[in-house]
UniProtKB/Swiss-Prot annotation:
It catalyses: RNA(n) + a ribonucleoside 5'-triphosphate = RNA(n+1) + diphosphate. It is an enzyme of class 2 (transferase). Belongs to the RNA polymerase beta chain family. InterPro entries: DNA-dir_RNA_pol_su2, DNA-dir_RNAP_su2_dom, DNA-dir_RNAP_su2_hyb_sf, RNA_pol_132_poxvirus, RNA_pol_bsu_CS, RNA_pol_Rpb2_3, RNA_pol_Rpb2_5, RNA_pol_Rpb2_7. This is DNA-directed RNA polymerase 132 kDa polypeptide. Keywords: DNA-directed RNA polymerase, Metal-binding, Nucleotidyltransferase, Transcription, Transferase, Virion. Part of the DNA-dependent RNA polymerase which catalyzes the transcription of viral DNA into RNA using the four ribonucleoside triphosphates as substrates. Responsible for the transcription of early, intermediate and late genes. DNA-dependent RNA polymerase associates with the early transcription factor (ETF), itself composed of D6 and A7, thereby allowing the early genes transcription. Late transcription, and probably also intermediate transcription, require newly synthesized RNA polymerase. The keyword Transferase applies. It comes from Camelpox virus (strain CMS). It is found in: Virion. Its EC number is 2.7.7.6.
Length: 1164
């Protein structure tokens, strides 16, 4: 295959982004954005949030104030590494301490006098414990000197039970674009949120709604619950911007379709009529009257001037330091979009579009919780001071209130999966797939309550805005999370920015904008508004917009602003806006730059020769105009060519229409999809199913499983895949392995391997083929007195325990064995008993079907004895275990065949696995055949011409034709054996061999597809799911077997099982299982008159309904199931009467059977 040609330049540039970039501080690209997000929080943002100085209470017109000051914030890393934390069974936390001072300020003639009320210097080792994110090589952001373990990528937290936790990224509820909604015909709303910049703490949120009803245009109002007045949007814009209504009319009508202009005129005319209806109308007086009315309505304690100042100053918090005039122009630009959206809704980004949303990363979770809990902490201090002053007359604070900030509980809840009372953010790391370390932190999902609303079911669809930024294959295909969790593509990441960087960047951009001629950036009537994070800063001359955007993008790429991830979006289509985004939580990815119809990659001749020695940051620095980091909003409003090949086939005029060009198709997949092979050669559903199965594959975990008491399934003899993609290699998924190479044959075997059944060779299993070891944690808590009690009668369950009451190391546990002594004793109140002490065993037993060896035992002594046992078990493939290829050809072991039963080739080689050949045709997985062909070709030429081992690159999605791969295989075979004939060469290339029948030693009539492939073992193991039970516990309500193997549960016998038995005519079995089984039998008496169930009063059965009517009905005894009685009782409790009626049948008479003569025939 050709290498480093011009046609592959885009592919090579894409690969540069995936590999580590130490010059830019990128050591592991897939999770780098998570590391930066958390590092920003714990190194910078936490100090900003906790460092506080503000008034708690004020008296006597602010001449006396109770102040709180939090300072000396210090964060200390743990003394040990994550491995030591796991061995000790402890969490891996950083300690945060601070000093709290509460004092009283009194304003006097001499100045301000300060009186100390309370002080607390937080040195408590449990004040605030912040879970530390473990990064690449076991690093943490507080102590970068920790040793590196190259295969440990981290991305996990360790909680107090030493359980590893990983989280997904949630889509933020607040949208950056206003949400348009049709309330009813001709009635619309436009809702938007305003959030203060990151440098303003505490963060202020305001939510506004603009309403418009065509039948009542005078009521086109803007409102906000308890934070703003309800006022006509046009008059508010006029009040803030200090312009005339005609100015607003011209601004709204500029570059609008005729139908929108008509609506604009109607709205302005309605506002005029509103002003004319008021005598001597004055806009200031009108607004002041509304503010006074709101002041009275809210019964505010503030003066009217303070109330008005607070309301107008806090209006639009995201434009906190912006003059009112710019706020007015911003409202006019919002109204433009609103009116246009009424007629052209499809052209406006809808609420499900990722353009409108930011993403919450790990650091943002902790930042939000720290901010909320700090406000609760300060509120508790304020309430405590007020209560003490009210009850005792002193300003004092209880020390308990000062020492309980509440952050520990919030962080603990976060790692339990609850972020702000919403489930789904964090989960326990599954210890069977190393790949989950990458896939879970790179997945993006929605709040659960965001999807409970029926109107938001459309959020489950693959939205057009997700194209290129999200993997279209790796989405859940079943269950409640269908379509809700998406994987980022390999080139996508999420932006992070420090507060200081944010302010510097905002300042530089504003200086650049103001460097233009003043009149050109003051086109507020007919210009294009320029916003930075939705805050209006200027309005540009329409004739300059293209030059401005082009120049801005060039300066951005050259590092003029000091940030390469700034997003600039030119919104045309009559909405007319230039949006500059610099905040955190934006989705970004690189694109190839097209400038004036030229692909900039092609106009840099030095790039190709120097590319091998450069990192991605070097390319951005030395060839800045080749690649641009583009956020999802800029991408949506830009013209992007799908591939370099298509771009080069266009004419010059067509090329000039494009701004960007995409990388090859393999970079649109996520890291899980990249572990598959050639999904574009298969049917569509195979990609989705393949991603789900790849995440279930058992891999080789890098953590020290013998020193960690934790659950896990681990591949014992893993092999690195031969056929890989670049993403699989750079993410270290390939190096950490998730399968083995096996020899397969596609054929039928005695009719055993039908459907998903596979045949596996016995000797292959005995040699350790796809062998795994299961590590399992067993944890019990025992009362101290029970643990110290001695058993009176020797129990078989305690045969594996030592004299100290704990299970022996290296003991083999079987089902029913106890893991620690737990004997409960009780004293009988019987004076005649010789020994009134009785004891009985209440220990938890080992419940697995297979024997396990005890590897480690840990004991903690508190008020209870906590025993943790780690067991290990080697588990070879057995019947029913599941396996799969990387093309979603899942199979279940149907038969384990001896080598002598299997067909063999001319060299005596037998296949390790036999797969049903019809599965290729039914599932259309052509790439599975290609993988076998490429793996076989590698086996004859595993080294390149330089003598280096080279895996075969077969990306998950690629534009390479199958003929190219066949040609590559042909070259490999011709190089190793140039004397092959055409037929022999064809058989080698297409892996076709003549196999011999093991019973007759004669060749089969047709050739068989026979070759090596990378095979995966899935976590679905027979012995983990199989359950055997004859009798046991039942549920109280329905009296069926309880659920769960661990609880000794069984199979619930329901309607489907009943129907199966009915189909077989097993009437007696049905009666026995459903009615006559133990306590399920129920005798009831039925009143033949009214059909009620008779009640039992003083051991006498009577019908309550008939007895009140002085009737004497006949009671008939019937036997029924307990479930039927429960059903009737519940229906009666809900006011529904179910009448039990008896079927009246005439008696049936059968004729006598014919007599049978049993005499022998010769006696007759």
């Amino acid at each position: 295959m050709k290498k480093n040609t011009d046609s592959e330049m885009d592919q090579r540039l894409g690969y540069k982004f995936l590999v580590p970039d130490p010059k830019a501080g990128v050591f592991y690209r897939p999770l780098h954005f998570q590391y930066v997000s958390y590092s920003n929080f714990i190194l910078h943002r936490l100090h900003e949030i906790l460092t506080v100085k503000r008034p708690l209470l004020s008296f006597k017109n602010n001449t006396e104030r109770i102040m709180i000051e939090i300072s000396n914030v210090k964060v200390t890393p743990p003394d040990y590494s994550p491995i030591i934390a796991s061995i000790k069974g402890k969490s891996y936390d950083a300690l945060a301490t601070f000093t709290v001072n509460i004092f009283k300020e009194v304003m006097t003639k001499e100045g301000i006098s300060i009186t100390k009320i309370s002080s607390y210097e937080g040195k408590d080792s449990h004040l605030i414990k912040i879970p530390l994110l473990i990064g690449y090589g076991n690093k943490n952001p507080l102590d970068t000197a920790k040793y590196l373990v190259p295969n440990v990528i981290g991305g996990v937290f360790i909680n107090k039970q030493s359980v590893e936790k990983v989280g997904i990224n949630l889509v933020e509820k607040i949208t950056t674009w206003p949400k348009f909604r049709v309330v009813k015909p001709n009635s619309f709303t436009f809702s938007f949120s305003s959030v203060s910049p990151p440098n303003v703490l505490p963060t202020r949120y305001r939510h506004y709604k603009i309403s418009l009803d065509i039948s009542q245009l005078e009521a086109s109002n803007i409102s906000s619950t308890k934070t703003f007045i309800t006022v006509n949007i046009v008059l508010l814009s006029q009040y803030l911007s200090r312009v005339s209504l005609e100015f607003i009319r011209r601004s709204l009508s500029y570059d609008m379709p005729p139908e929108v202009v008509y609506l604009v005129n109607a709205i302005i005319d309605s506002a005029k009529r509103l002003t004319e209806s008021i005598t001597d109308f004055n806009i200031d007086t009108y607004i002041n009257d509304l503010v006074e009315a709101e002041h009275i309505k809210q019964k505010s304690q503030l003066t009217i001037n303070e109330f008005k100042y607070e309301m107008l100053y806090n209006f639009l918090p995201h434009m906190n330091y912006t003059p009112d005039q710019l706020k007015g122009f911003y409202m006019i630009s919002l109204l433009r979009k609103f009116l246009y959206c009424i007629y052209h809704t499809s052209r406006y980004p809808d609420r499900d579009s990722m353009v409108c949303h930011r993403i919450l990363t790990y650091g943002k979770y902790f930042e939000t919780l720290a901010h909320d809990e700090l406000e609760n902490y300060i509120g508790n201090i304020r309430n405590d001071i007020m209560n003490n002053h009210k009850n005792r007359g002193t300003y004092a604070v209880n020390i308990h209130v000062l020492t309980t900030p509440g952050l520990n509980h919030a962080f603990s809840s976060l790692l339990s999966g609850k972020f702000k009372k919403s489930d789904g953010s964090y989960r326990t790391h599954p210890h069977y797939s190393w790949m989950q370390n990458i896939s879970i932190p790179r997945s993006v999902g929605f709040y659960p309550d965001q999807v409970k609303i029926s109107k938001m079911f459309s959020v489950r669809k693959y939205h057009p805005s997700q194209y290129l930024y999200f993997c279209s294959s790796d989405v859940p295909e079943r269950g409640p999370q269908v379509g809700l969790v998406s994987q980022l593509s390999v080139l996508s990441s999420i932006t992070n920015i420090l507060t200081s960087e944010y302010l510097d960047l905002e300042k530089k951009i504003c200086e650049y904008i103001r460097s233009y001629y003043k009149d050109d950036i003051s086109y507020f009537e007919t210009g294009f508004p320029i916003t930075i994070e939705n805050a209006l800063v200027a309005s540009l001359n329409p004739n300059m917009i293209c030059d401005f955007v082009t120049d801005f993008r060039r300066r951005k790429r050259m590092g003029f602003f000091g940030n390469l991830e700034v997003g600039i979006t030119l919104v045309r289509d009559h909405m007319n806006e230039i949006r500059i985004n610099i905040g955190a939580g934006r989705l970004v990815r690189p694109f190839l730059v097209v400038d004036n119809g030229e692909l900039m990659m092609d106009v840099c001749p030095e790039l190709e020769s120097r590319l091998d020695d450069m990192t991605f940051s070097d390319i951005q620095k030395e060839f800045p105009h080749v690649i641009e980091m583009v956020d999802i909003e800029q991408f949506t409003f830009s013209n992007v060519c799908e591939s370099v090949q298509k771009f080069r086939m266009m004419s010059k005029d067509e090329r000039k229409q494009y701004d960007l060009c995409d990388f090859p198709a393999e970079f649109r997949d996520g890291y899980v999809a990249s572990s598959l092979v050639g999904i574009n050669h298969n049917s569509g559903p195979r990609a989705i199913l393949g991603c789900a199965q790849a995440k279930q594959a058992i891999s080789c975990l890098s953590s020290d499983i013998r020193n960690k008491i934790d659950n896990g399934i681990h591949l014992m003899y893993p092999e690195r895949p031969i056929v890989i993609s670049k993403a699989l290699e750079t993410s270290k998924i390939a190096a950490n392995c998730f399968g083995q190479h096996v020899t397969i044959a596609l054929m039928s075997y005695k009719g055993i391997n039908q459907e998903d059944g596979i045949i596996i060779k016995k000797q292959f299993i005995q040699r350790g083929g796809l062998d795994i070891v299961t590590a399992k944690k067993h944890q019990v808590e025992i009362p101290l007195e029970n643990f110290n009690n001695k058993e009176r009668d020797r129990s078989n369950a305690y045969s594996k325990l030592e004299s100290n009451g704990l299970v022996r190391l290296n003991a083999f546990l079987e089902s029913g064995d106890a893991m620690a002594r737990n004997i409960s004793s009780r004293t009988l109140e019987d004076d005649f008993a010789r020994d009134n002490q009785i004891s009985f065993d209440v220990s938890e037993k080992y419940t697995d079907m297979y024997k396990s060896r005890v590897e480690r035992v840990q004991v903690e002594l508190t008020d209870k004895v906590k025993v943790r046992v780690l067991t290990m078990k080697e588990r070879r493939p057995i019947l029913g275990d599941k396996f799969t290829t990387r093309t979603s050809q899942k199979g279940t072991v149907a038969y384990i065949a001896d080598e002598t039963e299997l067909p063999y080739d001319e060299n005596g080689i037998t296949p390790d696995v036999i797969i049903n050949s019809t599965s290729i045709f039914s599932r259309k997985t052509i790439s599975m055949l290609i993988e076998v062909i490429l793996t076989a070709a590698y086996s004859v030429k595993p080294y390149n011409n330089k003598g280096e081992n080279r895996p075969v690159c077969f990306p998950s999605s690629n534009e390479t034709s199958i003929d190219t791969y066949m040609q590559f295989a042909k070259q490999c075979y011709e190089h190793s054996n140039p004397k092959l004939s055409e037929e022999e060469l064809s058989d080698k290339i297409f892996c076709e061999k003549i196999l011999y029948d093991p019973e007759t030693d004669k060749p089969y009539g047709s050739k068989v597809f026979f070759g090596p492939i990378y095979y995966l073992r899935l976590r679905h193991l027979t012995q983990d799911k199989a359950t055997v039970r004859c009798r046991g516990k039942k549920t109280k309500l329905i009296r069926q077997a309880n659920e769960g193997r661990k609880r000794g549960g069984g199979i619930k016998f329901g309607e489907m099982e009943r129907d199966c038995l009915i189909a077989h005519g097993a009437a007696n079995t049905i009666t026995e299982v459903l009615k006559d089984s133990e306590e399920d039998y129920q005798d009831v008496y039925i009143c033949e008159n009214c059909g009620d169930i008779a009640a039992q009063i003083k051991s006498i059965n009577t019908c309550l309904r008939c007895s009140k009517l002085n009737l004497s009905p006949l009671l008939t005894k019937i036997d029924t199931t307990h479930v039927s009685k429960v059903f009737l009782t519940q229906m009666n409790a809900r006011g529904v009467k179910v009448k039990l009626d008896f079927e009246r049948r005439p008696p049936s008479f059968y004729k006598p059977l014919d007599k049978v003569d049993l005499k022998p025939s010769f006696l007759k």
